[in-house]
UniProtKB/Swiss-Prot annotation:
PANTHER family: PSEUDOURIDYLATE SYNTHASE TRUB1, TRNA-PSEUDOURIDINE SYNTHASE. It is an enzyme of class 5 (isomerase). GO terms for molecular function: RNA binding; tRNA pseudouridine(55) synthase activity. The keyword tRNA processing applies. It comes from the Bacteria. It comes from Thiobacillus denitrificans (strain ATCC 25259 / T1). It catalyses: uridine(55) in tRNA = pseudouridine(55) in tRNA. Its EC number is 5.4.99.25. Responsible for synthesis of pseudouridine from uracil-55 in the psi GC loop of transfer RNAs. This is tRNA pseudouridine synthase B. Belongs to the pseudouridine synthase TruB family. Type 1 subfamily. GO terms for biological process: mRNA pseudouridine synthesis; tRNA pseudouridine synthesis.
Length: 298
């Protein structure tokens, strides 16, 4: 009999394989770690692989900071073929001759760098009236979608052998790389879809740091938690504040504490022993608790 689930806290950088959903990968890791509470920080489609940070226990309180972080991807485009879903899982809608050269592809990329508008794909988890768009799409219902602004920080041609091209994308959260591929194909006059997609970075985390499910499974059950990063790694971009024990205890109890420094905004708070207390808002000469680590866990 599997032992009772534990209060596991931390972040697992997972290298999700192709062929499973992000939730299936999460549930497998949760089972292997015997964890009570878990969540991920941004879905990868089943056909995609790469970095999928998973949050456990107290770390789930800070997952939004990574969910909203920039992402990096390596995408393989098939020019001249469009599919219903914009990826290899959808039926082929049209095939066209590809006349674009590598020089043409490279010349088309700058138009997609910066702030651009995207119409979210129907085959996405974006919700309309409480239901994900992909449910409407499967039922053959088309929903009008408003364009959304996203930011493409960088878009580079990594490899080129038409009708295939490999591009590296650095983008804001909420960017649909499938839509970017389709729009690039349209700009080249031939259409396109993604045949593969790998997330190579999320926030400050890199794919090279990630563990596979096979690696997690092969690790002794008692040593698996050693693969987790501490919860405060999710907010490492914020400035830190170290408090004495009395002030830290007050903050843990949900009370604001005086702050002598002239600063504003969110800060990471640590006690005198370097233990992460949580996040506080620096305002008007005090630190106001915003998101705290539970000191007693069931």
């Amino acid at each position: 009999m599997k032992p009772a689930r534990q209060a596991v806290d931390g972040v697992l950088l997972l290298n999700k394989p192709v062929g499973i959903t992000s939730n299936a990968a999460l549930q497998k890791a949760k089972w292997l770690l015997n964890a009570k509470k878990a969540g991920h920080t941004g879905t990868l489609d089943p056909f995609a692989d790469g970095l999928l940070p998973l949050c456990f226990g107290e770390a789930t309180k800070f997952s939004a900071y990574l969910l909203d972080a920039d992402k990096r991807y390596r995408a393989i485009l098939q020019l001249g073929v469009t599919t219903r879903t914009g990826d290899p899982e959808g039926e082929v809608l049209a095939t066209r001759e590809v006349r674009a050269t590598c020089a043409d592809i490279r010349a088309a990329l700058p138009a997609f760098v910066g702030e651009i508008e995207q119409i979210p794909p129907m085959h996405s988890a974006l919700k309309h009236q409480g239901r994900p768009l992909y449910e409407y799409a499967r039922a053959g219902v088309e929903i009008a979608r408003a364009p959304r602004r996203v930011h493409i920080r960088a878009l580079d041609l990594f490899k080129c052998a038409p009708p295939r091209a490999v591009v590296d994308v650095q983008c804001s959260a909420g960017t649909y790389v499938r839509t970017l591929a389709e729009d690039l194909g349209n700009a080249l006059g031939c259409g396109a879809h993604l045949t593969a997609l790998t997330r190579t970075a999320s926030g400050g985390f890199l794919l090279e740091q990630a563990h596979t499910l096979a690696e997690l499974e092969a690790t002794n059950a008692g040593a698996r938690q050693a693969l987790l990063l501490p919860a405060d790694c999710l907010v490492a971009h914020l400035p830190s504040v170290h408090l004495g024990e009395t002030a830290a205890a007050s903050l843990r109890q949900g009370r604001s504490v005086p702050d002598a420094a002239d600063r504003r905004g969110l800060v990471r708070v640590y006690d005198g022993h370097g233990v992460f207390v949580g996040l506080a808002e620096a305002e008007a000469g005090k630190l106001v608790p915003r998101r705290l680590i539970a000191t007693v866990q069931a």
